[in-house]
Amino acid sequence: MASEARESPANNPGLSTNRDEATKGYIMQQTMFRIKDPKASLDFYSRVLGMSLLKRLDFSEMKFSLYFLGYEDTTTAPTDPTERTVWTFGQPATIELTHNWGTESDPEFKGYHNGNSEPRGFGHIGVTVDDVHKACERFEELGVEFAKKPNDGKMKNIAFIKDPDGYWIEIFDLKTIGTTTVNAA
């Protein structure tokens, strides 16, 4: 298969084929976004994207809060604060929203850089949905801002929406992502 050749070590200098046994059990656990207003961000990630709040940590001395969100079922999560923290940090693919207190009401605060304008850096996170077109119809009804709709551009059947701080979220489904990427490559 042609796709196997692209992933082979010969075509990817620097790729190690010997996974160190010490890394067994590692997971991609979180990515962090700095946010201006937790009320707006929590509404977006819970109501629009359907995530649950897994854990909130407040650091009074340093004047910031952390909100961990994901798609895990919280009904079986531990209620003990320490156990809940350990449980949260064991979940794969969570989002950590970091709020520095006061930014939500500071007229001088201009927001954070999302990485998609110069100087480019971090690009986006991705969320798999059942049907990208139906999901995007719902997002439009909810007034979500789009960076790209599913029928725009050369890569069809993927979309990019923006959260309240302007971070991009790629939206795709498993029914179309394979052909979408193969046709664009």
Swiss-Prot record:
Residue span, VOC domain: 27-174
Primary enzyme class: lyase
Renumbered residue ranges of the record's region Disordered: 1-22
Record protein name field: Lactoylglutathione lyase
Chain residues that bind Zn(2+): Q30, E96, H124, E170
Family according to the record: Belongs to the glyoxalase I family.
GO molecular function, one term: protein domain specific binding
Gene3D superfamilies per UniProt: 2,3-Dihydroxybiphenyl 1,2-Dioxygenase, domain 1
Enzymatic reactions: (R)-S-lactoylglutathione = methylglyoxal + glutathione
Active site, renumbered: E170
Names of the cofactor(s): Zn(2+)
EC number of the protein: 4.4.1.5
Binding note for cofactor: Binds 1 zinc ion per subunit.
Residues the entry annotates as binding substrate: Q30, R34, N100, R120, H124, K154, M155
Source organism: Arabidopsis thaliana
Domain of life: Eukaryota
Pathway: Secondary metabolite metabolism; methylglyoxal degradation; (R)-lactate from methylglyoxal: step 1/2
Keywords for the protein's UniProt record, in alphabetical order: Lyase, Metal-binding, Zinc
One Pfam family this sequence matches: Glyoxalase
Known function: Catalyzes the conversion of hemimercaptal, formed from methylglyoxal and glutathione, to S-lactoylglutathione.
